[in-house]
Amino acid sequence: MRSITAIVCLLIAGATTVQAQQNPYDVALIPKDLLSYSSAVVRDKEVSIDVKDLENTVYHIKEVVTILNKNGDNMAHIVVNHDKNISIKNIKGIVYNSFGIQTSKFSESNFEDINTTDGFSLFEDVKIKRYTPEVTDYPYTIEYEYEQRIKGSLIFPDWRPNAETGVSVEKSSYTFICNPDFNIRYKEINIPTTVNITTDKNGLKTYTWQLSNLKAVKYEPFSPNPENYLSIVKIAPEKFSYYGIDGSFTNWNELGKWEYDNLIANRQELSDETINRVKEMTGGINDPKLKAKKIYEYMQGRTHYVSVQVGIGGYQPFLASDVDKLNYGDCKALVNYTQSLLKAVDIESYYCVVEGNQRKISLLADFSSMNQGNHIILCLPFKNDTTWCDCTSQTIPFGYLGSFTDDRNVLACTPNGGKLLHTPKYSTQNNLQHRSANFNIDEQGELTGDMITNFTGVNYTDREGIIHESPSERVKIMQEIYRINNMNIEKLEFKQDKSLQPVTTESIKIKAPEFASVDNGKIYFLLNPVNRILVTPKIIYNRATDVYINEGIIEEDEISYTLPAGYHLENKPEHRNIERPFGKYIATMKIEGNQLIYNRKFELINGTYSKDTYQDLVDFYQSVVDADSHNVILAKNN
């Protein structure tokens, strides 16, 4: 009996020892509810910001994240910026396998050190160190930490515990430490807890946010901006020093004033020669808007965009006189230069900070901070006709913004302070793609004919990338766009009307042998070969987010087929009319003599809709897919 008892005790002791020795980053230890919808799990993340004084801040991060599959790989990419005012200390890390067993180590020597070249970034003088673990066996875990020492106290990174959809969080914390006389403002967005503020005996203040067991938010098609439902804390100082420049702000007016006075003013001087040239060039134009258009096109014709590493932390534009001499600049420099040219003929304009993104991300009206916005555009406040310009493109029309910067709050930096303005919205009716096609089909099934398509509103730039390609590459791309069987392009032209209501026109002449199938005296072909919706949104059960349509559009197609003599339409003409709160679809066909005439209209209406309408949206798209797949059967007359 004693021996049996001893064995049992040994087994229990052994099991306890194995459990105690289990590696802390073993994937098996992740709570099961954190695996649902997850591609990555943040096991532990500690972010601390220690403001020593106005001119010295220490930023420290330590993170352990488990990558469950390749969709989570970006969470293992480590990117750390640095420049002459930001130094990196003690950067290191470890990679573990699924059992939490170390497989490799890395240090600063393993990082690639590169210059940033993002064409729309405001941080273009910043270098980055980048590291990506070479791991192909999933799951794996990466642990890393580093410290940045920053000369200044203007910009603090947001805390985003679940940085994106598909990421769950076991534990995450954000600690902000500062002296008694250093005051901050903060904004909590979708945070289930609130800040804990403590003060030690020396008056040192500590703000702490903590989260644990945060489930992943699954990706859902047609979802709103992630900032509407992911967790974020934003922090901004009241007083600060930025690379030797002191300042303070508690609202957008004060921040815009500081930016104008310290980063923009006194950088708009031009030579007398340039000023006289601009005055002479616009001398015969009385309308201020047309005068500004002339100047904008002059700027486009003599400059080109480059990523320039210059200025105070990437925020200060080149001198206008330098751009005038060198004929290049970044987004800041080209806006500043255009402002200077306009100023020469007494046209007022505003230097505006915007968040450039296909999603409409506005600067927060109730919370000002320097790290909102990544691009600069120009505003011309004409009376009852405010006009906006993006100065980084040498091809887009005067007054055109497009979907990258339309319909959002921006900060105008003026001598009188900052103003929150809103860029214009391109309405659904403006965003039109209208196509007219005239085709012939012969008895052998060959299709010949031509199409003309006009693009307006946000669609104006739909062919922008193609226009500047070589003729052979243009043809190749158009064959991908128009998936017509055996299509040969005999002629292809693009024209751009760059008036105040710009239009891109595409003209194409095609020939497609054996486009239609011929069998036993009948001809079969796809009614709509030029503009079909081919896929439906994924079915989502228990949807969590509202349905969001970012941009409203209208597509109109008019196709006329001349049918071969001696044939008639065998199948019944197709008519579809589908209408929902978020969209419409109308398709009709009719016979007029030897003409088969097909008309199609597809409309999406931008806006936010209840999550309960998502299945209606899926059904709507499925109905459109079915309608767009309609086949025509022509039969020979008896």
Annotate each PLM feature.
Residues 21-638:
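A sensor for short, sequence-defined functional sites
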Residues 1-24:
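Bacterial Sec-dependent N-terminal signal peptides
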